[in-house]
Curated annotation (Swiss-Prot):
Organism lineage: Eukaryota, Metazoa, Chordata, Craniata, Vertebrata
Residue ranges annotated for the AB hydrolase-1 domain, each copy included: 131-372
A GO CC term attached to the entry: membrane
Name assigned to this protein: Protein ABHD1
Keywords: Glycoprotein, Hydrolase, Membrane, Serine esterase, Signal-anchor, Transmembrane, Transmembrane helix
Bilayer topology term: Single-pass type II membrane protein
Gene3D superfamilies with a match to the protein in the record: alpha/beta hydrolase
This protein's record includes keyword Transmembrane: yes
This protein's encoding gene: Abhd1
Length: 412
């Protein structure tokens, strides 16, 4: 039996002309936005966790308010992987007039330093004592990375001289030996620090390492003790445990988004420098690697003389070396970093150390830390550098006695 009148009424009530469907969709969208905003404001903005010994903790709380203030990640991309990806896609590339310098290494290699000068600094008019910020990029990065350019600009705005240490081959220069770089070998960083201190012996030097560069800074500080030539260190998104890092990067989504593209870029560096490398290993086999672990097994651990990849990862992991660090270093990490899992952070060691402080944000990803609705310019990393460098260069009177603290007094 047909009910033409009922059918007609139902069709009419659901027709687009009556606005029922559009009103429903609008209501659902409004509800979705409200739920999203409610979740964001209830769960996402949080104060970072600051883990340090009591004197260093008090120093940071007093001179670096960013360490105790709520971090508000960008509203529309606060998840860790999104923060990591959008930092690469969205950040602007400010123009920095670098002056490049080639350094030769004791083993016959070479790499580039890129200097950014502030010749008429009103804060530090004496160029012999003008503070220097030494920046170390990520594993395949250089002085041209947007995050490095922004940090260099921040250093210049604050009146400092900036210099970027480009790992061998990362600025396009050819390798002169079979060795590029690895996270456990700090010989090139030692060459850089000595070179800077010879030229500017009276200038305080702060090393800022990002990701792979942060691992180098931590390992360098652990190896040199108080004789490293640095007044302090700052790391951002450093990977504390190499085993945990490669495990995290080999999960399906992280492998697709990060591991495979990063490995491909490193393989291109090896292939581009085939001539010196093929003297010690099979280049064709090495560049078939599809993961960081495979490349480290086939190239890095072999080139740097390790028994195997596990031995290299053990030597490269700063997680076990916190007690050996005797220079103040602030370490910024995000709990949702796909490269550096939070369970690998050395919380207890930092709590007992007078020199190492961990600044852990709930969000931020890997070299992300985007904040504000339109995060094209500055981000949380810039603010951390600005306040920490100022604290180190202007208020260092609170730092020399850190070593007299008793380890039991640490807190978080």
């Amino acid at each position: 039996m047909e009910y033409p009148y009922t059918t007609k009424m139902l069709s009419s009530s659901l027709s687009p002309q009556n606005g029922t469907w559009s009103d429903t969709i609008s209501l659902l969208l409004a509800l979705g936005v409200a739920l999203y905003l409610g979740y964001y404001w209830a769960c996402v903005p949080q104060r970072p966790r600051l883990v340090a010994g009591p004197q260093f903790l008090a120093f940071l709380e007093q001179h670096c308010p960013v360490t105790v203030e709520t971090f508000y990640p960008t509203l529309w991309c606060f998840e860790g992987r999104l923060q990591t990806i959008f930092r690469v896609l969205l950040q602007s590339q400010p123009v920095v007039p670098y002056r490049s310098e080639v350094l030769q290494t004791p083993d016959g290699g070479q790499f580039l330093l890129d200097w950014a000068e502030q010749p008429n600094s009103t804060h530090y008019p004496d160029p012999t004592t003008q503070p220097i910020v030494l920046l170390l990029p990520g594993i395949s990065g250089s002085s041209q990375e947007p995050y490095i350019l922004h940090l260099v600009n921040q250093a210049l705005k604050d009146g400092y001289r900036a210099v970027v240490f480009n790992n061998r081959g990362c600025r396009g220069e050819e390798l002169l030996t079979h060795r590029a770089y690895c996270a456990s070998n700090t010989e090139d960083l030692e060459t850089v620090v000595k070179h800077i201190k010879r030229r500017y012996s009276q200038a305080p030097l702060l090393a800022v390492g990002i990701s792979f560069g942060g691992i180098l800074v931590l390992n360098y500080l652990a190896q040199t003790g108080k004789a490293g030539g640095l007044v302090a260190g700052l790391t951002m998104s450093a990977c504390w445990d190499s085993f945990e890092t490669v495990d995290s990067l080999e999960t399906p989504l992280n492998s697709l988004l990060f591991n495979q593209p990063l490995t491909a870029g490193l393989c291109r560096l090896v292939a581009r420098n085939r001539k010196p490398i093929e003297k010690v290993l099979d280049v064709d086999f090495a560049i078939k690697a599809r993961t960081i672990r495979q490349l480290d097994e086939r190239y890095t651990s072999v080139a740097f003389g390790y028994k195997d990849c596990a031995a290299y990862y053990q030597a490269a992991s700063p997680r076990t070396k916190v007690d050996a660090i005797h220079t103040p270093v602030l370490c910024l990490n995000a709990a949702d970093d796909p490269f550096s899992p939070v369970h690998a952070f050395p919380l207890q060691a930092a709590q007992k150390s007078p020199y190492v402080a961990l600044l852990i944000t709930a969000r931020g990803g890997h070299i992300g830390f985007l904040e504000g609705l339109m995060p094209w310019q500055h981000c949380y990393m810039n603010r951390v550098l600005h306040q920490y460098a100022r604290a180190i260069f202007q208020h260092s009177v609170g730092l020399p006695d850190l070593g007299v603290l008793t380890p039991e007094d640490g807190k978080s």
